UniProtKB/Swiss-Prot annotation:
Name of the protein in its database record: Small ribosomal subunit protein uS8
Organism (species): Deinococcus radiodurans (strain ATCC 13939 / DSM 20539 / JCM 16871 / CCUG 27074 / LMG 4051 / NBRC 15346 / NCIMB 9279 / VKM B-1422 / R1)
Annotated Gene Ontology cellular component terms: cytosolic small ribosomal subunit
Oligomeric and partner information: Part of the 30S ribosomal subunit. Contacts proteins S5 and S12.
Similarity field: Belongs to the universal ribosomal protein uS8 family.
């Protein structure tokens, strides 16, 4: 049993990008699907689809990874911030600026999952799920 399924998702994406895989399959949940869709909107992955592989009981998210022209990684760094044992909540004023604004902090707010930029604009804080650049 996984104690932190979000950390598992981020690790699968990190490992797949380092080995230059085209896609990676992740056990599906609503939260992970929203996180993957946010990564698509922010331009870090190409696409995401929810499928059920033949002969399996549970849905998976098939994340299509994105690379640069020379197969360089688009995601250079991806890291879990708030963990089950140590939650990280911040107000809108204290939202982190990742790589001086070049990266993204994913924040779980009362308005859903938002990148730090949008959360700051809307004046909402929340739980910092992960950071990436």
């Amino acid at each position: 049993m996984l104690s932190d399924p979000i950390a598992d998702m981020l690790t699968r994406i990190r490992n797949a990008t380092r080995t230059h895989k085209e896609t990676v399959d992740i056990p599906a949940s609503k939260f992970k699907e929203e996180l993957a869709k946010l990564l698509v909107r922010e331009g870090y992955v190409q696409g995401v689809e929810r499928t059920r592989p033949e002969g399996q009981k549970f849905d998976v998210l098939r994340v299509t990874l994105k690379y640069g022209e020379k197969r360089e990684q688009v995601i250079k760094h991806i890291e879990r911030v708030s963990r089950p044992g140590r939650r990280a909540y911040v107000s809108a004023e204290n939202l982190p600026r990742v790589q001086r604004g070049l990266g993204v902090a994913v924040v779980s707010t009362s308005r859903g999952l938002l990148p730090d930029r949008e959360a700051r604009q809307q004046g909402v804080g929340g739980e910092v799920v992960c950071v990436l650049w």
